[in-house]
Each structure stands twice: as structure tokens, then as C-alpha cells.
Amino acid sequence: EMFALLLCGTANAQNITEMPSRLKTFTDNLGTVYASYTQTKTLPESTKTFSANGTVKFVKGVGFKWKQQKPNAFEFTSTLDSYCVNDDTQALSDLPYFSQIQSVIKDMLDGDMSSFITAFDADYIEDKKGQNWTLQATPKISAIKDFLSSMTLAGNTKDLKQMVIAYKNGTMIIINFKRMKTESADEIKC
């Protein structure tokens, strides 16, 4: 539904040079979030759609823990300086593209759009009467654009509702989020 805002053009898109007000309200309100997610993945060489679901816990300024429940259980945790898949910890510098994206997103969540603007060409859309927004980003720097075609985030002033990731190889991932009222005791550390 949020992605439809971008596709239907119900509002005027603007190129981002500073933090739009609704996006700023969203980042200011973001603290600790626990959400369920559903994910669909399509591969360019297949007509089959792959589905997954699970939970994610995000703590602003700390990182996130992604717990997939189906089809296979696994955990991915990202902190400010490391990441781990299940219990295998690695330095974040071992994944330079992910490290760069994580740094850009951290700055953006802290209210600083400068590294985002340096790394991405971005269009931002707000609906005319609600609280919804869509941010579509196309990478400008080679560390990111060598593998990523675009990333679209959609939400409102309280929640991220959807993320769409399009990779250079044609793979497309659509993730829908739903905030949960219960808190997770999961620690975000590797």
C-alpha cells in the first residue's frame, strides 16, 4: 500500500537536499522498535516468489537484530562496528557496502542528511492529506551502486511500513513491517 504512493504519484516528488519534515518527525520519534515482518523475494532467473517472515528489533544508535523464523530460522545482528549471523561475528569493515549503507542510515536517523545526499540521488513524496511518506534512493557512489539499483522506504511519522530493495542482478526484495506492542528482550550485540 505504501509503495503504491510512489507508483501512483498521488503527491509531488521532491529531490532531497535536506531532511523533509515528516521524515524528520519519523526519525525523531524512532527509539527502540520491535516489529514483525513479511518478506517476498523474486529472482530474475525464476518465476517463483520466495517468502520469509520473522521479527526485527531496532535500537536507535545501537543497531538491530533480524530474526527470521520461516522458511529457515537464523539471526542477523548489526551493531555500530560488527555484524553476526547466528553466532559468527565479523567486523563490519568486512562488508564495505553494508558498512557504508549502515553509516549513511545511522547519520540520517540522527538527523544528518549530508552523507545520504552524497551517497544517493533521492526523491521524496508525501501524500496530500495523511502522514505517509515515501523515499526512493538511487545510489551515486560505486561502493553501493555496484550491487544496488535502488532502495525505497515508505512509512508515516511513527513507523517504517515497507522497504523495497532492487539489486543490480535483478533480485527484488519487498519487506513489510508491522510494529508490535510487546517489547523484545533480545540484546543487540555480537
Place the predicted regions along the sequence by residue.
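One face of beta-strands
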Residues: 31-39, 52-56, 64-66
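Short, solvent-exposed helix-to-loop capping segments enriched in aromatics
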Residues: 100-116
